[in-house]
Amino acid sequence: MAAAKWLIASLAFASSGLAFTPEDFISAPRRGEAIPDPKGELAVFHVSKYNFDKKDRPSGWNLLNLKNGDISVLTTDSDVSEITWLGDGTKVVYVNGTDSVKGGVGIWISDAKNFGNAYKAGSVNGAFSGLKLAKSGDKINFVGYGQSTTKGDLYNEAAAKEAVSSARIYDSLFVRHWDTYVGTQFNAVFSGALTKNGDKYSFDGKLKNLVQPVKYAESPYPPFGGSGDYDLSSDGKTVAFMSKAPELPKANLTTSYIFLVPHDGSRVAEPINKRNGPRTPQGIEGASSSPVFSPDGKRIAYLQMATKNYESDRRVIHIAEVGSNKPVQRIASNWDRSPEAVKWSSDGRTLYVTAEDHATGKLFTLPADARDNHKPEVVKHDGSVSSFYFVGSSKSVLISGNSLWSNALFQVATPGRPNRKLFYANEHDPELKGLGPNDIEPLWVDGARTKIHSWIVKPTGFDKNKVYPLAFLIHGGPQGSWGDSWSTRWNPRVWADQGYVVVAPNPTGSTGFGQKLTDDITNDWGGAPYKDLVKIWEHVHNNIKYIDTDNGIAAGASFGGFMVNWIQGQDLGRKFKALVSHDGTFVGSSKIGTDELFFIEHDFNGTFFEARQNYDRWDCSKPELVAKWSTPQLVVHNDFDFRLSVAEGVGLFNVLQEKGVPSRFLNFPDETHWVTKPENSLVWHQQVLGWVNKWSGINKSNPKSIKLSDCPIEVVDHEAHSYFDY
């Protein structure tokens, strides 16, 4: 047990002035969602922690007492990949990645109060996850997902024959998606059953592929799809899953459907909201998500957008009757927020939904028959909601959330009542010592068209009588936001504790402030958003005395990387001592090399060949813009970023070098659009923070700050400088 002490929360402590370092950030325990048992007494959650000395990330599972917040270790077995309550007291079903079947997984059953006394119910012949269970007579029906072969079998990579050639051949899109070249395998939902024999359950290894019979369907949909893309009715007889429209080009359109299919696969799945279908509300052709059955299984709620090629359109709640041809109903359709998840109360009368609102992921309730103009009510909680589950059959929910000041917030929330705190990581984990909400505040500034929100994040031990350089962080998306939530990549508090005050703006294009602000960035990437940033910088410069803009820096990733590249060629670029561009576009016409064409075709009002002028309008490589470049810039771009090719970063660095602008190129050949591997993340922080600290003067004012020399990776430097006079 001593070796597993990190699995349990340590004793609470008082706040101190110690800085939050990248090592603290990366090695802090990471906790998954807490899922309560059927009675609402215990919850189980996954936890892992990276160890820099051993270069590993051991993991395990904990139990959370829902009465007093106490945490205990359930298991330290890292091979246990998921645990689900069996629906029978404290019994659980879990998946073990080590199995007698090569490449397969084991299905085990145990009791949370005596986890070591487990037995194996059976094996699954391949990688399998996302279990959902429901009693059906004397059986327990389940669904989960894995990769499917073209024939419909569960794909087992370990058993697959080695290809004689590395060639890839394509007749349609996608060729590659986010970080992977698309192959013949695809995600599919499979169904099976646990059969009771005496006091034990067994699984015969037989699975039914519910997706493959629908040609070109896929569920969960990559790269972000998971168990939220499907659901199992309470009687275990019907399955709902989301798939992109099989008959439409997936790279060009976002249209997706909710399919219904018998658990036993006796009929082929059929969509309930097919485009222009008899049940589908007129004009609704966008992406569907979050299907969930009502407690009695007679209705299904889901979310859907209207526009067929816009991934950031507003989601609206829809409810369909199962086994009926009645039209689908839209619920609270005029609410100017975009729900992200929906669940039914135990009596089926109330819907609980999460939605981003003013840079915070909030929980709301509304009647299941709410009219179009109904405004959902907020349920009080701290931070942003990641997931929520009902506590027994009550109206209370167990929220797993986080914030800018804590990476895990477990709390119970009840409509009309104050929230009840169970466990907040910043009050327990030594790595998060000193973090709290007092160092964070909102800022509202008149932007190009409307008031624009930003977060101000102050360093540990902040003194209002001192002056701190500005760290101006620009978010990606562009339809995204800096929310009151924890980031495991770009974390404002890590930047602040180098000695900066962070200003993290949510300019035009941001989500959570009404759909108009989100939509207004369309075909205007370098227009209103840039003007918003200028106005925010000017407000900070003129009004906030403790922020030193003369020694400020700016950094951003994805769209934020584009904006940094755009700023380099604008007047605002001369206001910063250093810039950091991570995976940002450089040449306007290169956008055609992306994967999801619907994204660029929406944001630039047409295809690459029909609306070329729109792609070129916000081209950071224009000669008249490049002529202004002079601010030192770090460029980060990774080989497995298929959103925009690594050539974008190399090209940007080429020009910076030939221009004689102090610059550096950071590349990870094994990373994607993001840097996620712990050791790579540490190097990323050493290089990025070391770069800005060098030019902002932080290295001189804060001797403990990160320096470029802290990074052990040898720098490639074959010549004094690339600049020469033609």
From Swiss-Prot:
Keyword annotations: Aminopeptidase, Glycoprotein, Hydrolase, Protease, Secreted, Serine protease, Signal, Virulence
Main location: secreted
EC number: 3.4.14.-
Enzyme class: hydrolase
Any Pfam family the entry gives: PD40
Region Disordered: start-end pairs: 269-291
Subcellular location: Secreted
InterPro entries to which the protein is assigned, alphabetical: 6-blade_b-propeller_TolB-like (IPR011042), AB_hydrolase_fold (IPR029058), PD40 (IPR011659), Peptidase_S9_cat (IPR001375)
Coiled-coil regions listed in the entry: none
GO biological process assignments: proteolysis
Family: Belongs to the peptidase S9C family.
PANTHER family on file: DIPEPTIDYL-PEPTIDASE 5-RELATED, SERINE PEPTIDASE S9 FAMILY MEMBER
Name of this protein: Probable dipeptidyl-peptidase 5
Native species: Trichophyton verrucosum (strain HKI 0517)
Phylogenetic classification of the source organism: Eukaryota, Fungi, Dikarya, Ascomycota, Pezizomycotina
Gene assigned in the entry: DPP5
